[in-house]
Amino acid sequence: MADPFAPRTMKRRNVKGLALTPAAPKPPPTAENAPIHRDSDQHAQLEIGIEFNLDLRPEDLEVIKDLGSGNGGTVSKVRHIPTNTVMARKVIHVEAKREMRKRIVRELQIMHSCNSEYIVTFYGAFLNENNDVIMCMEYADVGSLDRVSRVFGPIRVDVLGKIAEATLGGLTYLYAKHHIMHRDIKPSNILVNSRGSIKLCDFGVSGELINSIADTFVGTSTYMAPERIQGEKYTVKSDVWSFGLSIMELAIGKFPFAASEQLSDAESAPAGILDLLQQIVHEPAPKLPKSDAFPQILEDMIQKCLYKNPDDRPTPEELFERDPFVQAAKRTPVDLREWAFGLMERDNRKSHLAPQLSPATADLLRSSDSPTATYHGDDRPLETPTSAYRVDPRRGPAEGSAGLADQVDRLYIRD
């Protein structure tokens, strides 16, 4: 059986005739948020990081819009003018000498060899005139799962299974093939694009970068395993704790630890964070609330991930290969592209700046030809685990459930 995590071959045929310096670059896109999969050329350009090491220069990156910022830096959607490739550019402010920053950039180049369907494509890294570290990577037009959860609420259980499968697949690939631990698993570092692909970003490939910015990301510490908060050694099982916490957050629509509810977005008092970290270390691990929305095998998986003693936790590979919830998720067909379309369509209603789906695409999503046909043209909310999980056999499928009960039944399979 072929190794599912074997790196993709570097000998790829350049079917689109891509060149680093084309004679006539394509004009910039007219729609700022055009879905990736609607342009086959763009899909091919996204593979360019696999075929080439781009000679990235600041003057070749045209900013389309800012995506976010934090203590550690900023992220923008940009267009690489020579290749007309849309990218996500991350500017990281590093407090270090220039030689150390150069070393960080060199360490980041290993990301060129990380070729997996579960990992964002890396285009390159360099230092700008301010000696900031600049990283360019694949742009995910739907966004992070943190944003999806905040805007749309709890994620339904069949999609949650695919998120678990992709996240564990990415963690297993990184460690098995490159001996890299992610070190920062959380919903904001799990991205989704309009093709329905779920991918990891911001993994700990550069030890120097981790050391340089570790003190600037206070929020990340809330996803740290108890052993890391206490200063003990980081292992791949520390990633498993963060994975379990993230999956629970996406399932219930909020951060699982109760102390987090006492922290407002504007509050920066160290006492609030310290109380939360104390709870993570000393209080019992959170559990999924009792609900028909959550199959027992999901509860069991999360419980295994949140054992306080790391020796009791499984590895990402053990979960990916043998956990009943993940195996059931692998067997459950889910149209993630349609799910992603639904999220973007909801966003389109909220902003006149966002592109609208073409009539042909909307008709396709409404038609019975679509595998699950859950797209709605009206304002009905997206299904959540609690609204679409159970079906009364006397009444048949709930309105809008679109076969979700059948998919959840598959998630109960334990063999």
From Swiss-Prot:
* GO terms under biological process: MAPK cascade; positive regulation of appressorium formation
Q: Name one GO molecular function term.
A: MAP kinase activity
Q: Known consequence of changing S212D?
A: Leads to constitutive activity
Q: Which Gene3D superfamilies match?
A: Phosphorylase Kinase, domain 1 (3.30.200.20), Transferase(Phosphotransferase) domain 1 (1.10.510.10)
Q: What is the effect of changing T216E?
A: Leads to constitutive activity
Task: Read off the InterPro entries from this record.
Answer: Byr1-like_cat, Kinase-like_dom_sf, MAP_kinase_kinase, Prot_kinase_dom, Protein_kinase_ATP_BS, Ser/Thr_kinase_AS
- Domain (Protein kinase) spans 61-326
Q: What happens when the gene is disrupted?
A: Produces much less aerial hyphae and conidia and shows weakened cell walls and higher sensitivity to cell wall-degrading enzymes. Impairs the formation of appressoria and the ability to infect rice plants.
Signal peptide: which range, if any? none
| Subunit (UniProt) | Homodimer. Interacts with the adapter protein MST50. Interacts with TRX2.
Regarding protein family, the annotation reads: Belongs to the protein kinase superfamily. STE Ser/Thr protein kinase family. MAP kinase kinase subfamily.
Question: Per its record, how is this protein called by name?
Answer: Mitogen-activated protein kinase kinae MST7
**What lineage does UniProt assign to this protein's organism?**
Eukaryota, Fungi, Dikarya, Ascomycota, Pezizomycotina
